[in-house]
Every structure is written in C-alpha cells, then in structure tokens.
Amino acid sequence: MLRANVVVSLVIFAALMQCMNGKENITPWIYSMKQPVSCNREHSEIGICLSGIDDDIQNDGKCWKFCLMVAKSGGYNADK
C-alpha cells in the first residue's frame, strides 16, 4: 500500500511539472521575486494587477492609470 501511495504521489508531481511547462509561476496572481517592485500589485480600490495586462500602457491598463494618477515616486512604491 505504501508503494502505491509513493507511485501515485510521483505521478501527480510529474503531471504538475508538465502543466507548468517551464514557467516560473502557473498562477498569474503569484508574482516572481525577480520582478521589479511596482505600483500597487494588489490595491483595495482596483483589485489585483496582473503584470503585462493591467499595467500595459498600450491597452490603457487599470493599474497603469491608477499609478499615474495616485501613486507617489512616479508610479513605483519603494515601500513594498
């Protein structure tokens, strides 16, 4: 029985690794530590800011607008 549990655990682990397909994070709300500290990743007024989507100047992203209008330090908060 223990051997079967180990095999099942390894199969699940391998399946998860395949789903990740080399990506750092498989969930968009978890941010990489390598990213620069940016303006309001999560803010009570605008919600979660998805990197590359909500901060995209070309698509007029909600977080980009908020950072320009409200945030200090030119849109970046060094405190976070």
From Swiss-Prot:
One of its GO terms (cellular component) is extracellular region. Its main location: secreted. GO terms for biological process: defense response to fungus; killing of cells of another organism. Residues 1-22 form the signal peptide. The keyword Signal applies. Keywords: Antimicrobial, Fungicide, Plant defense, Secreted, Signal. It is found in: Secreted. Coiled coil: none annotated. PANTHER family: DEFENSIN-LIKE (DEFL) FAMILY PROTEIN-RELATED. Belongs to the DEFL family. This is Putative defensin-like protein 28. It comes from Arabidopsis thaliana (Mouse-ear cress).
